[in-house]
Amino acid sequence: MCKSLRYCFSHCLYLAMTRLEEVNREVNMHSSVRYLGYLARINLLVAICLGLYVRWEKTANSLILVIFILGLFVLGIASILYYYFSMEAASLSLSNLWFGFLLGLLCFLDNSSFKNDVKEESTKYLLLTSIVLRILCSLVERISGYVRHRPTLLTTVEFLELVGFAIASTTMLVEKSLSVILLVVALAMLIIDLRMKSFLAIPNLVIFTVLLFFSSLETPKNPIAFACFFICLITDPFLDIYFSGLSVTERWKPFLYRGRICRRLSVVFAGMIELTFFILSAFKLRDTHLWYFVIPGFSIFGIFWMICHIIFLLTLWGFHTKLNDCHKVYFTHRTDYSSLDRIMASKGMRHFCLISEQLVFFSLLATAILGAVSWQPTNGIFLSMFLIVLPLESMAHGLFHELGNCLGGTSVGYAIVIPTNFCSPDGQPTLLPPEHVQELNLRSTGMLNAIQRFFAYHMIETYGCDYSTSGLSFDTLHSKLKAFLELRTVDGPRHDTYILYYSGHTHGTGEWALAGGDTLRLDTLIEWWREKNGSFCSRLIIVLDSENSTPWVKEVRKINDQYIAVQGAELIKTVDIEEADPPQLGDFTKDWVEYNCNSSNNICWTEKGRTVKAVYGVSKRWSDYTLHLPTGSDVAKHWMLHFPRITYPLVHLANWLCGLNLFWICKTCFRCLKRLKMSWFLPTVLDTGQGFKLVKS
């Protein structure tokens, strides 16, 4: 007995000590990474101090000594605020501002007369060491998972260091100082572009780096110091392109959730930047050396640029108008689990963004052409403005590109509930006994509430929820379904998904039992769908809570030319009443809606003993379905709705771009593999891409 107790005690002690060692190892690793960051910062501080000391020693400029001593004094105050008053934010802000300012001084003070000095060489090596340590620290932090990514455009550290660097540039002449300040703004735009993972962020980074070699940009006298400043700021957003796990709307949250006035002002600000760039480009007309090339080129491409950027600004304005509508819904239903993603999808934002992506691409193309035609290698202000405009338009293109790819399509739903549970031998509904009326009414009301909750949760536009105790005639149902199947979005195109829900009596073959002895076959419903859908690539999802839904599930698998799915239920008829209640209509709806509207549900469709099982089937081409891409007519309608008539000639160019399909071979192979998977290995859970899933037991 004592041996057993001793063994248990020693085993528990061993486990505790092992866990303590693991925790200590994790803490030590985290501390090591932090110390590596401190080392990089201290190394940079030593390099700055040594560099400023060399400049004071060689030039005997007393102002450098004053600034140097003041800088050390400020850093001392920052340390006191941090360690003695626990004012971390104020301390770090002050130190970052001065780091940027002192590093800027190190960049812009002339060192041509003592480039080969030993202390100057030591400063360069210290700066290079700081670059290596900074990159290593950022990389290890991300590999070890110690970085918690938060949605932001510019961090406080980046902003303050950029401001400090810009202030340091005021030691130069006004024109040179303005060029550097604009270059700092361009660097800030590039950082935001990288952090947002814009589609063209990497090409922008390459262009920015290449253009820094132009002496007209007044890049500093000390290129090593400027490289240190540039790389230390770029490292984090560049690495986050791979390591950041934020979704599209999370990354763009500081912009998408901004107030209406701020977002409108951002469009005005963008327009002012574009106009300034155009005016600076026009300075090229003063070059009389190549007037025969410059004047015609600027006239032609300048007009093209103006038309494209009128469209660009109108597109941004229209985007914010639609986003304001989404905000109204979002703030009205904040307690109803509604996210901005689903609201934007339901408002047709995806279709708008796909068209806008092409239009903004024209703006980028026009800017690149105008920049090439009016290239001014000796004008630093022009080059800095060019580097500001490129990331600005790249961010707009990236926003539309990513929203167009990640947002779900529009959807509309229609529900029919016919509460009947008792039928005559010929299959027609009969009157219910009085004792069952209240129970059936409660169950039918529960089904209606559940399906309405489903529509509201997934932001599905509701055409109607019909509840009829006497049944629907064939003509009435035909007219209602006809109106439902021809519904369109506010912008004009058809909805991407049409969801039809039915709960009521069915025959053994799956046909819906209607009033007056009529029935509705699946073939008839498919013919109505073909008539209304035409060549458009919408899809139809039929949800059945009935006793005989399996025949429709099997029959839909034979359809070749449409995107149709049937989600049905199987009610187990042989149930031990002592163990469980017999299944009834409405039980499947309750479970299916809970499964799709509550992420923390405990519903398992494959568990044994379920009295209500799920089954679904899809048409043969279901896996080929993609959300509707803008056609030529869609682009033309969008153009007529949002843009002036003078811009209509660009419709043909937009249509041509829509028609490009450069990867058709890869897409064909991928489509065949998906068809094979859906026909042979039908998944237990099928994501529809609209936020809800089809399931089978």
Swiss-Prot record:
Its main location: nucleus. It is found in: Nucleus membrane. InterPro entries: TMEM168. GO terms for molecular function: sodium channel regulator activity. Belongs to the TMEM168 family. Plays a key role in maintaining the cardiac electrical stability by modulating cell surface expression of SCN5A. May play a role i the modulation of anxiety behavior by regulating GABAergic neuronal system in the nucleus accumbens. This is Transmembrane protein 168.
